[in-house]
Every structure is written in structure tokens, then in C-alpha cells.
Regions:
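Long, charged/polar, soluble alpha-helical segments
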Residues: 1-130
Length: 130
């Protein structure tokens, strides 16, 4: 049971950082946004690590469908999608549906990594222009 509490605590921390990211986006504060996204990714990785320790090799994540059409999504809509997935994961945790929570967190990670990748690309392009 202690593992479930740790997972839920990490998941809540991830959601809090994601909310901070959305607020930074609304304020058009790119530095805070990038920093908050980094914290989201770090907390989400920790959450997924805790899930993986709980489940070990019991599941086949390759069956979890990720959205392949993430080429040109806006940052805001991508963050909202990740937020919805993480809020749903939190509800699953409350209902003791750990596998469903794990799946949603795993898919949310895909969206967060997409945002990070886009930020890195913009930063590289800005450096090339200088």
C-alpha cells in the first residue's frame, strides 16, 4: 500500500507542475513554461518508474496506443490533453485501478516529450539565427 501512496503523491506533483506550465503558457512566459515542463517530465518519469517497479514485467506496453498524429499540435492543446490523461490517472488510482492509471500516465508522457522536443527544436533554430 505504501507504493500506491508514493505513486499517487508523484502523480499529484506531476499534475501541479503541469498546471503551472499551463499558467506560464497563458502568461506567455516562455522561461517559466520551459522550466515547468522540465519539472512535469521529471515527475512523470518518476511516477512511471514507481509504476514499473510495482508491475515489473507483468504487462506489455506495446499494446498501449499512442497518438501518432502529433506532428503539428499546439503546445496548449497538447498540455491540456496530457492534463486530462493525468487527471484520469489520478481518478484511477483513487479507484485502485493501477493498470489504467499507469497506461494514462504512460500515454501522457508521450505528449510531454513532444512538447519538450518542440521547445528544443525552437531553441536550436533560434541559436542558428544568431
Amino acid at each position: 500500500m505504501a507504493a500506491n501512496k508514493k505513486i499517487l503523491k508523484a502523480l499529484k506533483s506531476t499534475i501541479t507542475h503541469l498546471e503551472n506550465s499551463i499558467h506560464a503558457l497563458n502568461r506567455k512566459d516562455e522561461n517559466s513554461l520551459a522550466e515547468s515542463i522540465w519539472h512535469v517530465a521529471a515527475e512523470l518519469e518518476y511516477t512511471l518508474f514507481l509504476f514499473s517497479v510495482t508491475f515489473q514485467d507483468e504487462i506489455d506496453k506495446s499494446k498501449w496506443k499512442l497518438n501518432p498524429k502529433l506532428k503539428k499540435l499546439e503546445v496548449g492543446s497538447t498540455l491540456v490533453t496530457a492534463q486530462d490523461l493525468l487527471n484520469e490517472a489520478e481518478k484511477y488510482m483513487s479507484n485502485k485501478k493501477l493498470l489504467d492509471a499507469y497506461k494514462n500516465a504512460y500515454i501522457a508522457r508521450h505528449y510531454i516529450l513532444k512538447v519538450q522536443k518542440d521547445f528544443a527544436k525552437k531553441k536550436r533554430e533560434a541559436l542558428k539565427k544568431k
